[in-house]
């Protein structure tokens, strides 16, 4: 008690209980108690409940209100910055645990060349989106204005405790490449303008009305606020000027994603995507059966899918695909074979995948078929069985599962996949199964390092042998991996294996050093390498994707020609490191050290295989980092002469 009183006096400031904001008082109390003993979420709930009872507040203070009070005290210089308190109060910390925060924006309603029978077609929404979806609702409320959408989302993230200086911008809505060319360019320019000017905004909150909906269980928050200086905000005159400014902006776009259909993955569009600094494509694949695609009016073929993904690889893009189990004409065998096919066909093998189990919603042809008893919707048992089998038997360690279900409110779903927490339920059931069956768990873990070779760091690494179409060759520099101990992940994908909150801070002086793991597999362009730093159980800290193109599969653009290897992604799964100049933590040093180690290994493999250049499809602000590693900007790629 004496120690607590000491810290309370240390952090407290004189106040009049009749006039002081009670949330300020509560923040000071939380800081004081955390100084004595680190608080967890349960402790925080107890403190808030006791405080509300003592102060006779009408309800328990929400974390959003406390975060606002914290920032007010910080702004008034009455407290010092406290990372632990910010993390404790942060809403949905997982949104920034992968190292970035995602901002989704939607384009305006516009016709789509497809006539998919499962797609909703609301009059005032882009094709396939429903106005009650959280992201779509935010776009509709902001009249699909890209600047307003970004401002709104960044403000929401900031007020819920997330740093927004590293942003993955995701452009959704209809078939973007079918829109007029000027609109596509202006939309992207506006995204850069919004990020460049967000820090200049002057925001006024009416007292006592922080949010329209202040429930802590709500996914999205709409803030009542007024932007008082919008008329004085100056935007860039050109796209290139906006991109250049973003290199040093406080809120930087580190990745830009757009959606497309297979028939739009042309050389012309690939070049345009790079000029907009697009780094990732999401492609609607849906099925690997031509009869299923035709029955659902997709109006493209499996061969077009294969050719499109081949083209994306040639240009060095990172890509995601969408798969829809349960489409009209489905069987379990066809749905399962689709997953087997995409990870055995060298033309597919996606970096990322989204499961979108088919749902029956109104305003669709599929709904009419369902009403006529011509379509039998998926059951939850069917979906869980398929997910379970693909997790345990198919999904490889180099891919990432981004979603298991689409974010459509259950109230909008007439039949089919309508459990919004399907991912959580499936993961929990699989965890119980693996805990009770060690042999099955060991079988899953063994697929992490199938037929691996263990070498030491002194051995010259030369990887020249080709792989079979569905084979993964693994080389480990470090210690023998642990294939026995139970771990929390139930799938081998990179998202399941992120280090997240399980890690302890690490530096080069620690006894235990992560292994350097090199997984090689075959693609249609030629040889792919997934190079990562992992602990002995397979949890990922850092990774990169290296592509060695066949000499006959190269394109002549920006030094992407013969004898040029490609880095398609360099990613760090560590708590977001802020880009502020005054932050000088061990975390930042780790990022630079391990990033350079991954680059060094990619360069070594490239040189050993007689490649003369290494080209990186880099984010805008990362150019400075690559320049320090002796890379130069050539066209829209960073290139190093080996």
Ranges and model annotations:
Residues 583-605:
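Conserved acetyl-CoA-binding loop-helix of GNAT-fold acetyltransferases
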Residues 132-149, 169-192, 204-320, 324-385:
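Conserved non-cysteine loop/helix-boundary elements of the Radical SAM core domain that shape
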Residues 295, 325-333, 349-378, 397-427, ...:
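Flexible glycine/acidic-rich beta-alpha junction loops that bind and position SAM and/or redox cofactors
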Residues 518-575:
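A conserved beta-strand-loop-helix scaffold within acyl/acetyltransferase catalytic domains
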Residues 3-149, 153-231:
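Flexible, acidic/Gly-rich N-terminal and inter-domain linker regions that tether
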Residues 618-637:
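Conserved active-site alpha-helix within GNAT-family acetyltransferase domains
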């Amino acid at each position: 008690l004496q120690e607590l009183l000491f810290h309370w006096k240390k952090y407290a400031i004189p106040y009049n209980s009749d006039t002081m904001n009670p949330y300020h008082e509560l923040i000071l109390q939380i800081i004081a108690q955390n100084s004595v003993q680190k608080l967890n979420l349960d402790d925080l709930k107890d403190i808030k409940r006791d405080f509300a009872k003592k102060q006779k507040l009408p309800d328990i203070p929400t974390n959003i209100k406390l975060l606002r009070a914290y920032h007010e005290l910080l702004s008034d210089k009455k407290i010092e910055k406290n990372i632990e308190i910010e993390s404790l109060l942060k809403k949905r910390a997982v949104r920034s645990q992968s190292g970035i925060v995602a901002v989704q924006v939607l384009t305006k309603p516009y016709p789509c060349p497809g006539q998919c029978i499962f797609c909703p077609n609301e009059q005032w929404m882009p094709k396939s989106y429903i106005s009650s979806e959280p992201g779509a609702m935010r776009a509709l409320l902001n009249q699909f204005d890209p600047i307003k959408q970004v401002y709104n989302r960044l403000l929401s993230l900031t007020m819920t405790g997330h740093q927004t200086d590293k942003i993955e911008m995701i452009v959704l809505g209809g078939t973007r490449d079918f829109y007029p060319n000027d609109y596509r360019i202006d939309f992207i320019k506006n995204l850069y303008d919004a990020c460049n000017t967000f820090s200049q905004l002057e925001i006024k909150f009416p007292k006592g009305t922080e949010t329209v909906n202040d429930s802590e269980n709500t996914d999205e928050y709409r803030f009542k606020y007024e932007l008082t200086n919008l008329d004085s905000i100056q935007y860039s005159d050109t796209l290139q000027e906006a991109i250049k400014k973003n290199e040093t902006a406080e809120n930087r776009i580190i990745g830009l994603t757009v959606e497309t259909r297979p028939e739009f993955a042309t050389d012309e569009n690939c070049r345009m995507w790079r000029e907009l600094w697009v780094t990732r494509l999401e492609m609607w694949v849906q099925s690997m059966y031509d009869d299923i695609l035709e029955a659902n009016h997709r109006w493209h073929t499996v061969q077009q899918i294969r050719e499109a993904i081949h083209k994306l690889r040639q240009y060095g893009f990172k890509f995601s695909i969408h798969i829809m189990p349960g489409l009209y004409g489905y069987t379990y065998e066809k749905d399962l074979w689709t997953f087997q096919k995409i990870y055995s066909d060298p033309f597919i093998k996606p970096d990322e995948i989204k499961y979108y189990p088919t749902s029956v919603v109104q305003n669709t042809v599929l709904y009419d078929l369902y009403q006529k008893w011509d379509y039998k919707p998926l059951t939850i048992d069917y979906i869980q069985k398929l997910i379970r089998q693909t997790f345990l038997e198919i999904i490889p360690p180099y891919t990432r599962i981004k979603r298991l279900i689409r974010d459509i409110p259950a109230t909008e779903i007439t039949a089919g996949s309508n459990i919004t927490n399907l991912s959580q339920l499936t993961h929990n059931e699989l965890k119980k199964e693996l805990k009770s069956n060690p042999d099955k768990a060991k079988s899953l873990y063994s697929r992490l390092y199938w037929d691996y070779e263990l070498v030491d760091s002194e051995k010259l690494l030369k990887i020249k042998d080709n792989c079979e179409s569905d084979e993964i060759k693994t080389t480990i520099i470090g210690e023998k991996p642990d294939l026995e101990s139970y771990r929390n992940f139930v799938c081998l994908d990179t998202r399941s294996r992120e280090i997240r909150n399980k890690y302890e801070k690490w530096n080069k002086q620690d006894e235990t050093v992560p292994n350097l793991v090199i997984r090689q597999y075959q693609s249609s362009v030629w040889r792919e390498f997934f190079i990562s730093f992992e602990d002995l159980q397979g949890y990922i800290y850092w990774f990169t994707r290296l592509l060695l193109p066949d000499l006959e599969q190269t394109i002549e653009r920006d030094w992407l020609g013969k004898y040029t290897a490609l880095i398609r992604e360099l990613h760090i799964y560590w708590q977001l490191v802020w880009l502020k100049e005054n932050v000088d933590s061990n975390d930042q040093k780790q990022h630079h050290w391990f990033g350079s180690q991954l680059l060094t290994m990619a360069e070594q493999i490239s040189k050993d295989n007689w490649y003369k250049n290494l080209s990186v499809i880099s984010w805008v602000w990362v150019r400075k980092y690559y320049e320090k590693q002796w890379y130069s900007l050539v066209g829209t790629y960073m290139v190093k002469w080996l």
